[in-house]
Regions:
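Charged, often Cys/His-bearing segments associated with DNA-binding zinc-finger transcription factors
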Residues: 1-40, 313-322
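Helix-centered, glycine/charged polyanion-binding patches within enzymatic domains
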Residues: 159, 219-220, 225-295, 299
């Protein structure tokens, strides 16, 4: 694939660098994180030759911007036209055209088709682990509900598969009906960095997902009562992981006073992960998914996890410098 990038910056490039608007978060991310391996993997999926295309590295960074600031494809195109800090972050040269919304959309489809979105969070976390930001001692696991991007169908249509979003489903929480998806996350207990993230239909039982998102290299895993199943207890024992899951009562087993006290202690640790969901929903606009289907919404969640970790890294480094 041919690209538009020139090796030598123009005079105007240098002028823009000197007067460009300051965005400390983006500058810290650009300085501290190496995107080269991710860029190489994406670029390798393109055919060699043909007409010039927007560079994969530019589009990858556009994806990150979108999920840092909750931007749609048209909004991303518009903001890139106007904000020098965004142009600088995506490494867009002054002679390069800003990618339009169609190009951004096609790049997203390419990531899904090639399965590369599954590697993006792992590539970032490898760097964070190497620098000691992800500590594998304590892992927190939890899930949150995210609304569907489509209007709720009636229950009969949903059961018969006639809903506009076939992968969304109904569930109940706090005695209220909810239609959409469920985002499952595991995080590092020390710095609250996301280690793994998976999307499921809203009716998916939390306990069935723990083994898929909880890293097996953890020393102890804290999770809600929904994960207190025999299968999860066996999985923890098989991997030599201490059980920090809150105990739940069964119809034939009552919790002792000691169990209740232990649950309270575990809950104090586990609830730290709720800050991640609060950030995703408030600052990264994740109260509602943007797309239809599990595949596209898994990509969205993965990119939001990448963006969250990048912003969290910038915050940690800023606190250390203070």
């Amino acid at each position: 694939m041919q690209t538009k990038r020139e090796n030598q910056p123009t005079f105007f490039d240098l002028a823009v660098q000197q007067r460009g608007s300051v965005n400390r978060v983006l500058e810290t991310i650009a300085r501290e994180v190496d995107f080269s391996e991710a860029e190489t993997r994406v670029t390798a999926t393109y055919r060699q030759g043909g007409r010039p295309a927007c560079r994969a590295g530019v589009l990858l960074r556009v994806m990150i911007l979108q999920h840092l600031y909750g931007l749609s494809d048209p909004q991303a195109e518009e903001q890139l036209q106007d904000r020098l800090s965004f142009q600088k972050f995506v490494q867009l040269d002054t002679h390069e055209a800003v990618p339009d919304e169609t190009t951004i959309c096609r790049f997203r489809q390419r990531l899904i088709a090639c399965g590369l979105h599954e590697a993006l969070l792992g590539l970032l976390n490898t760097q964070l682990e190497a620098r000691g930001f992800i500590v594998k001692r304590v892992t927190l696991v939890d899930a949150t509900l995210v609304e569907s991007s489509r209007k709720r169908p009636d229950a009969q249509a949903a059961r018969e598969g006639r809903a506009p979003d076939a992968d969304a489903s109904y569930t109940r929480k706090y005695n209220q009906s909810f239609y959409g998806y469920k985002a499952h996350v595991s995080s590092d207990g020390e710095h609250q960095l996301i280690r793994a993230a998976a999307i499921s239909t809203a009716s998916q039982y939390d306990g069935e997902v723990l083994a898929h998102i909880a890293p097996a290299d953890s020393e102890v895993i804290y999770a809600d009562k929904a994960c207190d199943t025999k299968a999860n207890q066996a999985w923890l024992r098989a991997h030599g992981i201490r059980n920090g899951i809150l105990k739940k009562e069964a119809h034939h087993i009552r919790l002792t006073a000691a169990d209740v006290a232990q649950n309270q202690k575990k809950s104090l640790v586990r609830r730290q992960i709720e800050r991640i969901f609060a950030h995703l929903k408030k600052w990264q606009h994740y109260r509602r998914v943007r797309y239809l289907g599990l595949a596209k919404n898994q990509l969205e969640l993965t990119l939001k996890a990448v963006a969250y970790n990048l912003k969290r890294l910038a915050g940690i480094l800023e606190m250390r410098r203070a």
